[in-house]
């Protein structure tokens, strides 16, 4: 079992604070905010698959935005009333990493949701590296693109 210090060393201070203590990276500073390469996004802590570039869009909010997870079962939703707001927190299912929040102001044609996710909680796996990195089963997501 990885200790907190080992995890912090492996993923970095910001990713640790975001995933383990529900911190939020500053808007427009994350690596994946204005990033639209073909591939998948996984939990930086556990490597579990979360989102696809096919469902990513530019919401202008300053954080990566997705219309949905690859499969709904991959994330869990939790009520969040911190900072005097009522929001829905999104966590990874296996590791329980804080990812961000989901809002109901996303593109109507894509289901109306906006998963506003911290770049620091994610690791991007480029399409051409998915098989090598152990994510070959998800290559079929891109068959029709």
Curated annotation (Swiss-Prot):
Q: Which GO terms describe its cellular component?
A: cytoplasm
Main enzyme class: oxidoreductase
Question: Is the keyword Acetylation in the record?
Answer: no
Q: Which domain of life is it from?
A: Bacteria
Annotated catalysed reactions = L-methionyl-[protein] + [thioredoxin]-disulfide + H2O = L-methionyl-(R)-S-oxide-[protein] + [thioredoxin]-dithiol
One MF term in GO for this entry? Answer: peptide-methionine (R)-S-oxide reductase activity
Alphabetically, which GO biological process terms does the record hold? protein repair; response to oxidative stress
Keywords, ordered alphabetically: Oxidoreductase
So what EC number does this one have? 1.8.4.12
Using the record's annotation, list all stretches that form the MsrB domain.
4-127
* Record-linked Pfam families: SelR
Q: Which residues carry out catalysis? A: 116 (nucleophile)
Name the protein family: Belongs to the MsrB Met sulfoxide reductase family.
**Which HAMAP family does the protein's record reference?**
MsrB (MF_01400)
Identification of the protein by name: Peptide methionine sulfoxide reductase MsrB
Question: From which source organism is this entry?
Answer: Streptococcus pyogenes serotype M3 (strain ATCC BAA-595 / MGAS315)
């Amino acid at each position: 079992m990885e200790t907190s210090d080992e995890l912090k060393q492996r993923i970095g201070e910001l990713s640790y604070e975001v995933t383990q203590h529900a911190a939020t990276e500053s808007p427009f500073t994350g690596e994946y905010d204005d990033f639209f390469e073909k591939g998948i996004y996984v939990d930086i802590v556990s490597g579990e698959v979360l989102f696809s570039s096919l469902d990513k869009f530019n919401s202008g909010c300053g954080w990566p935005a997705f219309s949905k997870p690859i499969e709904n079962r991959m994330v869990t939703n939790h009520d969040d009333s911190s900072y005097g707001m009522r929001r829905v927190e999104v966590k990874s299912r296996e590791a329980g990493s804080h990812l961000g929040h989901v809002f109901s102001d996303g593109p109507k044609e894509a289901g109306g949701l906006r998963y506003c996710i911290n770049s620091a909680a994610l690791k991007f796996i480029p399409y051409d590296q998915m098989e090598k990195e152990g994510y070959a089963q998800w290559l079929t997501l891109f068959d029709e693109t």
